[in-house]
């Protein structure tokens, strides 16, 4: 058996040598093939960058132009990178949504179903959209090429070469982040859906026009889309029509390509995005909507253009403690505040108050509201500057609660700022057809609204020379004007009521134009105002017809609605315009008698001042039954509150630092309307040292915030024990209207000297849930009878946790009051937690002593634990709590 030849020696044999040589010679050509293109591209970039320098020298331009061009290029590049970065971050969020939510659970830009329990997540719908997205893309591509492209070419002779060279809608499809369903008990024939739409697409759309190319390589669109299924039917297809619109302007960002990259230049990018947003808003944002009939033969006119559901009147009164923005060299300055008030596409701006951190506007704005719930009132405050206005804070109020409560007068804390409060009075005006609701006032406020449904016109003249009144026939026309006048007019309409003017769209080249648009006007005087209408030609810039219609002619019509064809003046004999005019009166309707007040300001029902007077000497405490005689004389607590409220109509409603009321100078019976609840006696003929207690129940007539008055000098109370019985009785009597008082009885010492042994003091808290802001509001009024830590008293402050949350970021803390055992804080804190979750939590309130670092003084002064599940948070509550070491009440 012959041995096998080894394989190793054959390796260096002849056949392998040429191969090695070939391998050793290969890197040379490859390296040269890679370096040459890179070298060419580098030289091209250098020449491209140096070209502006050469042109500047050749043209004799200054170096300033070079610096300006470089600055603009850097700015464009920065904006471009930022837009690409945001697009990549959005793609990353779509691909890793679960990890992102778990990591950034407490972020601000999370889907709505995380923050609001009534918004449902619909992953099943997203899976269906993903599955059918390729087929939808093919359908949209065919529609664009077959219908949209020919229409664009027909618009102008310069667009005849317009072509969509690429239509690719990408793999990323629209997503529904959450769905909220609204059901109206008053109208059971419709279903309303709010869809949180998010489209972060990788689409690529390219167009070409005369060898000029441009396009889009990415789109971001986010907004709330409302879908209304109305009316519901008893037979197939069970739904009459589908109405779609955005509640607010959607957020839009577009990544341009080709020559359209110029739209990303500084100053132009914001303008281009805003123009596209306005284009979408003109068709799909309230009050504009798209209605698609599902059942054949169904009249969808009222669905396409419905009447407003109401009008909200916003009284922009004042603001306090706004942030300082006009700082110079780090020194504190002032601000020049103004406010922007908006609802949907309706915007108003207040005047500017210069150099004032506590401005007073006293301005009134009126807005029409079309969808409740859905539309919100937005108020943004800015500091006016010459370059760019600084942001001072914002506020967003749900109009659904305002509609229920009719009138809301309250101070609101501003969001997204360090400090600042805004005082608003909101009035909900209902639309009525009753002739008795027609009022005339001289205050400049609206008394009615007029809704004009502009349908169409017929037999319009081609030009003013077609009038048959003989006025223009004698005039001669030039050849150019004759050629223009021979075509049908491109007409539009101008409608004016008072000082407000609207312009319709232009219908090109038609004697019988169809507009089908709606316009709404505020009317100050129905008897004096009229609707002025002009039909104008867009090309000849002349009037084709005029109509002046007094609004008082609508009053005899049924349901204050007039629909007919109107003859145009200064037009052809048979030139008519078809309209439907609807008039509605405005009035603030009162709440039903006996219904509980459950609005956003359920605390405010006054103010109700109850004055208690005591003297140092010569006054004997009345028996307990006499002290409470007037209080308990009525069996109906609501009637007591009503009677007490009537007696203070002439008292100022301001709640900031109220002054004590003057005392009577002589003996006599006390008036029961005002001071029947004193429960104290007065000694005639002696000088009194009054101590006033304000039981402030803020309400619709109270413009001020929830605030306690300053403590006054404390007299001696030899009859302090009966007072302890009087104050709780007053709280219980007023619990029907609102159990949440601003009980500022800080001047009463309810504990005798010996009874304080073993007690740590008391703290007064006012707690309620504000439905408008979806937050729990805690007002720390003050403390009394605290334990001294030094010979000068203590330096107390209050710390609050909303258990079980104990993070440092969620802690609320008042300011420190120096050297006092009865501090008055009057500080408000808000916890933004849904109502359903608040009822499962509790408040941990601790009073502490501020001490320097390393000091051995006492830190804890007392603690209170409040179980919120046992409280009525909508009405609210206000009371004194005894401080204990562990927060639990003493047995």
UniProtKB/Swiss-Prot annotation:
Topological domains, Cytoplasmic: 1-32, 76-891
Segments on the Lumenal side according to the record's topology features: 54
SMART domains associated with the record: C2
Positions of the SMP-LTD domain: 118-295
PROSITE patterns named among the record's database cross-references: C2, SMP
Protein's job: Tethers the endoplasmic reticulum to the cell membrane and promotes the formation of appositions between the endoplasmic reticulum and the cell membrane. Binds glycerophospholipids in a barrel-like domain and may play a role in cellular lipid transport.
Assigned protein family: Belongs to the extended synaptotagmin family.
Domains: entry comment: The SMP-LTD domain is a barrel-like domain that binds glycerophospholipids in its interior.
Record PANTHER family: EXTENDED SYNAPTOTAGMIN-3 (PTHR45761:SF4), EXTENDED SYNAPTOTAGMIN-LIKE PROTEIN 2, ISOFORM C (PTHR45761)
Protein name, entry field: Extended synaptotagmin-3
Classification of source organism: Eukaryota, Metazoa, Chordata, Craniata, Vertebrata
